[in-house]
Amino acid sequence: MARACDLDSRNVNYGVTDEFQSAKGEMQLYALIESGQTERIRVLSPQCRVTSRRDVIDLGLVEVDESLAWLKDHVATREAFSSDALAAVAVHKGSAALSFLIDMADAGPTTELRKSAIFWMSQARITESAGELERLMFRDGSSEIRRHAAFSLSQSTAANRSDALIRQGREDGDPEVRAQAWFWLAQTGASASEEAIQWAVANDPDDDVRKEAVFAMSQLPEERGVEALFAVLGNQRMPRDVREQALFWLAQSDSDRAFQYLDRLLAGAL
């Protein structure tokens, strides 16, 4: 049975990437218009059964160009729901929608609008926009945009996401950008994560980045995080503060092996 989408709830959303990918040529676009003013925009999967206390007027199928033109006006004039409008733009087929997203990501009038465009490119148009996201990760002058592009790529299905995050973690000139790259790499669970993050712990010139890289290890899936933290603790060449950080995050783990290690440490057996 299809799940229900309540248009009266402000929390109802377009869902996740899978919903976009499952759409077969059509999406449901809803707008709440009161006294001639658009108050809300929602784009929903065709599989979502819509409910509302208000009367819903069905306009039928709308041509792509007409729909895009209406949405573009709302991106430009109503920042309150520009992200919702950009999400709706993202699910439109064709080059015009993608070009608009790229333009907003590259040179939107506000940082928040740029970030929204970047996110929806990653969620709904990743096959076509992976290269653009990488360009923003490595060439944009704003560290906030580079961080957000990395986050967005990490939340996508892009095949190259782990390679791009590793490169950013090694090469970006901003310590905060490098630190966040390691965190998002760990969240992807990519097989190359441990080796790459261990490199950062051992080699990054910034103390805070090294500490954040240790934290990133704790975010690796299941026992992989515990193993990575054990490796730091067992490396006598690591600075004391880094090993202490590894011990701290190990203590936050629910792993039985971590508890056993801590018991032996407290008993003086290590």
Question: Can you name each region flagged by the protein language model?
Answer:
Residues 79-80, 95, 110-112, 142-144, ...:
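Alpha-helix N-cap/helix-start positions at coil->helix boundaries
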Residues 43-44, 52, 80-91, 115-120:
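Non-membrane alpha-helical segments in proteins
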Residues 1-73:
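N-terminal accessory interaction module
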Residues 83, 115-116, 147-148, 179-180, ...:
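Alpha-solenoid HEAT/ARM repeat scaffold
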Residues 62-75, 94-106, 126-138, 158-170, ...:
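Amphipathic alpha-helical scaffolding segments comprising HEAT/armadillo-like alpha-solenoid repeats
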Residues 148, 179-187, 193, 197-202, ...:
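Alpha-helical adaptor scaffolds
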Residues 87, 119, 151, 183, ...:
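Residue-level signature of alpha-solenoid helical repeat scaffolds
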